[in-house]
Amino acid sequence: MTPEFDEEVVFENSPLYQYLQDLGHTDFEICSSLSPKTEKCTTEGQQKPPTRVLPKQGILLKVAETIKSWIFFSQCNKKDDLLHKLDIGFRLDSLHTILQQEVLLQEDVELIELLDPSILSAGQSQQQENGHLPTLCSLATPNIWDLSMLFAFISLLVMLPTWWIVSSWLVWGVILFVYLVIRALRLWRTAKLQVTLKKYSVHLEDMATNSRAFTNLVRKALRLIQETEVISRGFTLVSAACPFNKAGQHPSQHLIGLRKAVYRTLRANFQAARLATLYMLKNYPLNSESDNVTNYICVVPFKELGLGLSEEQISEEEAHNFTDGFSLPALKVLFQLWVAQSSEFFRRLALLLSTANSPPGPLLTPALLPHRILSDVTQGLPHAHSACLEELKRSYEFYRYFETQHQSVPQCLSKTQQKSRELNNVHTAVRSLQLHLKALLNEVIILEDELEKLVCTKETQELVSEAYPILEQKLKLIQPHVQASNNCWEEAISQVDKLLRRNTDKKGKPEIACENPHCTVVPLKQPTLHIADKDPIPEEQELEAYVDDIDIDSDFRKDDFYYLSQEDKERQKREHEESKRVLQELKSVLGFKASEAERQKWKQLLFSDHAVLKSLSPVDPVEPISNSEPSMNSDMGKVSKNDTEEESNKSATTDNEISRTEYLCENSLEGKNKDNSSNEVFPQGAEERMCYQCESEDEPQADGSGLTTAPPTPRDSLQPSIKQRLARLQLSPDFTFTAGLAAEVAARSLSFTTMQEQTFGGEEEEQIIEENKNEIEEK
């Protein structure tokens, strides 16, 4: 283009011309694209007349210039060829690095493809192999001129024997030495230039790598900030994952140190990349299409961008005000600006280092090699990238591993590491148990509210029946939390048991040790169970009195221990049916149906004092289920029989009684009624306990045939004694919530079977019960 280029003139077949044609604009002046060529031809025509003066010069001068050009032709060509190889190799390596590091946005890649398609071809493998910087071996390889000079020198020595005189060797040796020195200096200079280009190529690769690593690290930091905000805002009250002192904080106050580090590093890197791009546009201009201002963000004034970018030095207060307290949206906007500015810088650098912008061979000098351009453009940009990357990495690692309690344990003695690891395992199990129980409690509260609405509703039976599948589905959703809580509780108990066993081994083994590895030593002192003055955890509220349905008639047929009349059997059968009906109602509200193995396991863990003293060794659930597991019907319908058997068989306790389910509470007034199995486990100085024992009907047969039997006592006579025992249990200060709740359920089920006004029965059953009572009074 000419210096008098008019902005209103549009060249024909140019991209701008085609763009205006597509938009329908035709009101502009069209200039032929051949005008630069014609201008060039005219200038060449003006320069041709001086060449016609050449024949007027002397013939000797012309011959001298020809010889001079012939002598130095090879050396100049060799030098130009080496510089050209170094220039092209460095440019191709730089373009390959920029494309391979993926520091360009897709929009910039498309713009490069439009402006200079040859840049994208530099990333191909074949072009990249051919465009490598020449190695030192290739630079030291002699060319044809060196070989021809050596061959001419040898031929002269052979053709002229007089040159073999000793006096002439010194002259030829000096000439050969000077030639070798000159050749070595040129080779050393070229090798030094090649090493310099290689070093700058590595610097460019490091800068691109740091830029990409910084972008990825900022993305991770923003994700961590966003996750922390979501957790603290949405799940604090449900899962208690955030400490209470942070629950009331503003979302932007979480990870405030990381937010400040992200802002500082993004701001510094953005300003450095912006200045480098502006410097390229000013000092290394390209054509008008490549340097169009609409393609660059760096030309947008700082005041329009905001976020405190226009200030050279900004205080923390001002940054807080500009970014609305380092809010997440402001940081995301600044991150998008950095990504666009970084991609813009590498796009302009790729256009500048394109092979199309390489100077021609005669004009190429070491001062015009592209590594000097790269050094001048980048200046302090690599240092800014590395410093910001280190600062942000340090802050991110601190908040990622220390604030979220994922820091590594400090190096210390091996024993301390093992102890800390075991305590961490216990803490992890307890923490998991807490979260599962809280989630379970929330689900149960929601389910309870829905059940209350269904109970109090006045809707038709059809609408109520439609809600039953929903209730069943919600109960199934609760089951995983119950199982997970049980597993976490077992894990915590096993970890604590390991710590206790190790502590016992350190202090000294007891004199009498059991050979069975699964058997643990019972401590001499019974541990005291302290109940905190707060709401009990849902695990203590589980009622384990519910069992699977068992055929009661078959139990009566097998029972040879009691001799009852036909009327008594019918009366007890009706009472069992009534208790079974009551249990079905209780099951739908208070609990869920458990298997035999799970119920036995939960009883041993939750309601037996023996489980506190013994380790969680693998328990075979077959024997306790088959021999000592009571049915719910027998638990609720045979209270009088169990109490009578407990009073008459105090001295006949066997090993099968240890596996019974006991509901215990401390009571010093009932020390005389304590059985022999409790005396074997605990010392005489321990507090006496009151036991409500649930036995199966198969236990008397396992105990032996020598046991004395007593006829069953009527329930009306046993009810006052049970109420007195319950009153004593309620007065006990150390009475646990679980034992009291289980005893209360048993008492209520007993009262349901003997109450005069039946809730679930009919009028015919009431008459039968009154007749039975009259018969008992007559007897």
From Swiss-Prot:
The keyword Nucleotide-binding does not apply. Residues 430-462 form a coiled coil. Residues 618-719, 757-779 are annotated as: Disordered. It is found in: Cell membrane; Cell projection, Stereocilium membrane; Cell junction, Adherens junction; Nucleus. Residues 638-649, 770-779 have a biased composition (Basic and acidic residues). The keyword Ribosomal protein does not apply. InterPro entries: Myosin-bd, Vezatin. One of its GO terms (molecular function) is myosin binding. Plays a pivotal role in the establishment of adherens junctions and their maintenance in adult life. Required for morphogenesis of the preimplantation embryo, and for the implantation process. PANTHER family: VEZATIN. This is Vezatin. It comes from Homo sapiens. The lineage of its organism: Eukaryota, Metazoa, Chordata, Craniata, Vertebrata. The gene is VEZT.
